[in-house]
């Protein structure tokens, strides 16, 4: 059984027991989080496709940790003008373990 959920402006395919990184959520470590924006659920009977969401479907997970991704470097410059700007960025994320998919 798997589901496709929407969180943080992204769509993720999840199964029970999966560990996924989502955009930062304002919850504590160990807290339960519920994703109710479920776009598709696959069961033994077949696919349930939402238009746009599957009614009554929920995906429950537990927050494992909050973290920050690897640093990326943004470097802008203009040729022959001595204009250079270097900036780093680390995107915050929340790591979630998927516990249950309900329909």
UniProtKB/Swiss-Prot annotation:
Q: Name one GO molecular function term.
A: rRNA binding
Question: GO biological process: what's one of them?
Answer: translation
| Domain of life from the UniProt record | Bacteria
Keywords noted in UniProt:
Ribonucleoprotein, Ribosomal protein, RNA-binding, rRNA-binding
Q: Which InterPro entries match?
A: bL21-like, bL21-like_sf, Ribosomal_bL21, Ribosomal_bL21_CS
Record GO cellular component, one term: ribonucleoprotein complex
Q: Which SUPFAM superfamilies match?
A: L21p-like
How it assembles, according to the record, is: Part of the 50S ribosomal subunit. Contacts protein L20.
Q: Its biological function?
A: This protein binds to 23S rRNA in the presence of protein L20.
* Family of the protein in this entry: Belongs to the bacterial ribosomal protein bL21 family.
Task: Tell me the protein's name.
Answer: Large ribosomal subunit protein bL21
Q: By which gene is this protein encoded? A: rplU
